[in-house]
Amino acid sequence: MSLLLNGSVNGIPHSKPYNYSTLLSRFIESYNELQSYKSGKAVKVDGRTLSVAAVTAAARYHASVELDDCPTARARLAKSRKVITDKVESGTSVYGLSTGFGGSADTRTDQPLLLGHALLQHQHMGVLPSSSQALDVLPLLDPNSSTTMPESWVRGAMLIRMNSLIRGHSGVRWELIEKINEVLSANVTPVVPLRGSISASGDLSPLSYIAGTLVANPAIRVYHGPAAYGARQTSPSSDALTQYNIEPLPLASKEHLGILNGTAFSASVASLALNDAVHLSLLAQVCTAMGTEALAGTRGSYDPFIHATARPHPGQQIEAAHNIFTLLEESKLARLHETEVNIHDDQYSLRQDRYPLRTAPQFLGPQIEDILSALVAITQECNSTTDNPLVDGETGEVHHGGNFQAMAVTNAMEKTRLALHHIGKLLFAQSTELVNPTMNNGLPPSLAATDPSLNYHAKGIDIATAAYVAELGYLATPVSTHIQSAEMHNQAVNSLALISARATLNSLEVLSILMASYIYILCQALDLRALQSEFVSGLKNIINDELVSIFGSFLSASQEDTLSKKLLTIMKSSLEKTTTMDGVDQMLATAASTTTAFVDFFGSSEFTDASLLGSVVALISHFRSQVASRAANLLDQLRRDFLSGERGLAPASSYMGKTRLLYEFVRVTLGVRMHGSENYARFVNGLGVEDVSIGQNISLIHEAIRDGKMQPIVASLFT
């Protein structure tokens, strides 16, 4: 996408290209990269080019991993390793090689291997399920998920740790990196405690479980066996390595610390979070475009003049507005152009959309910029060395520093999580407007497709989304403000990056549920708009028919046309104001709204034969009765046709712009039908027979978001 930034020449405003990497371009690039890995391309570990997409591919989709074993890479590691062996042989004092750890670095030893064992021993302190046997008391939380990391987090951490070690700054052997990859490739995953890391000297304890697996510590358990939904088999690491013919690797000096001292777990969880955050922030723009259609809003709110010229923040005014504007091309539901009207013609109606639509680019844009900033930071973290000490193989110098301090990850996650809340808040505001008959431009209350007295369809969703956005607000609270001094006050400041990344994944889960709920009601609203459009077309014919039948002998053709248009306008206005009524009552009220127009018309100078006025007025009641009856029958027929699928699985498609691809994915691919068939049949078969529950349909959409099945649809909207 070409972005523009305003400027001026001789005082005349103009726009010029602005070099900015858009969220959309990053999403498309990442999506294509992920697809290549899923198609068989190996993730390359070279210390420089690891991407969020690559981490996602290896962590979630079991993509193969290939080490860059070029002579240069091997030589770099060999030089770094030689520095360590030389220091050991010469008796040089080096942190973690001859000293204790952290606040205990004042101790000394000439036993580096035993020192490594002591390091692993004291870090293997996490709380995990002690047995897989059934409990004799029901737990308050799931014993596994409440204490144990998901496998995808651990797999991502193993990949990132290899990518850091291969840079040659850690003093480890090539064989160590190969062994991690061998374990990863065999789909043997350490069981790692969920809690216990403050991400200060890296994620020490979680990484110690990877080290414990490599040395076949029988106290460390691993997942293994066929991949399946849910938990796999767990066994002691020693048994699993034997089963898969993997030789344990006795660690050499400094290698215990080389594995533990890094930010791999924080970076892994952050990478997985950002992969989904980019998708959801783009999906929010698609939802806003669909919301504009569903609410009969105006495309003009996203006009380039407002955003690319007047206030050209890159992510905000330019990208978000451009995407939404483009998605609304050729929509028959959104107003594509502002139409100037007389002040009396739009009296008592809003002249512009409310804030949730009209200011969506301004609200979404800063979130896009923050997520892009986080993406840059986490990508850099995945391609950095986060050890201490660091080894310069060229000079032989050992540097004592603090690259393990993961505040870069924390900041990235804090801003991402806050952005997710703001996205959720915007979509919540749109959704509450959509289900409210006083705000949704003529849609029925709770988006009921049948008589609203016995159909409260989206009311539960309206309540639930309030709970979701409230939880997002709670989760958006910074984690870093809760940093505590730790480890003998040596780690007096720390990052809590892993905790922050975990909280961000929680936010993503809540936001994806909220978005699934919104997409569900958007599809319902769009179907109702299509139904209304067909109803208005039918109503126009009914009015014309009844005018000719009842008043034809009193009116000329031009008078019939004039009166018909006026009556249709009045009845459309009445329909919008009476959506809380059941169908029959609404049609009676709508037909009754024509009375004044008839009286005004036949009492005007246009109707010249005053002697017939009494006869004409007597026929108005008959006209109202006929129109009300036929309109009620038409509405009932349309409801039956739409709900039964006679109008197709996706009846609103022809009315929509580019957003129809997402709508069709929900309606056709996922099989989520328009709601209301049980209500139309007056629950003759009870609940859950003719249709699944509302929650089951929303769950299908949520799973498509969560599992990445919706990403190809979003990508296709922009390519």
From Swiss-Prot:
Main location: cytoplasm
Keyword Lyase: yes
Compartment(s) of residence: Cytoplasm
Active site residues per record: 95 (proton donor/acceptor)
Post-translational modification: Contains an active site 4-methylidene-imidazol-5-one (MIO), which is formed autocatalytically by cyclization and dehydration of residues Ala-Ser-Gly.
Residues at which (E)-cinnamate binds: 261, 352, 358, 388, 459, 487, 490
Reactions catalysed according to its record: L-phenylalanine = (E)-cinnamate + NH4(+)
Annotated crosslink 5-imidazolinone (Ala-Gly) location: 200-202
EC number: 4.3.1.24
Pathway annotation: Phenylpropanoid metabolism; trans-cinnamate biosynthesis; trans-cinnamate from L-phenylalanine: step 1/1
GO BP, one annotated term: cinnamic acid biosynthetic process
UniProt-listed Pfam families: Lyase_aromatic (PF00221)
Gene Ontology, cellular component aspect: cytoplasm
2,3-didehydroalanine (Ser) carried by residues: 201
A single GO molecular function term of this UniProt record: phenylalanine ammonia-lyase activity
Keywords: Cytoplasm, Lyase, Phenylalanine catabolism, Phenylpropanoid metabolism
Role according to the record: Catalyzes the non-oxidative deamination of L-phenylalanine to form trans-cinnamic acid and a free ammonium ion. Facilitates the commitment step in phenylpropanoid pathways that produce secondary metabolites such as lignins, coumarins and flavonoids.
Description of how the protein assembles with itself and partners: Homotetramer.
PANTHER family: HISTIDINE AMMONIA-LYASE
Family to which this protein belongs: Belongs to the PAL/histidase family.
UniProt-recorded name of the protein: Phenylalanine ammonia-lyase
Gene: PAL
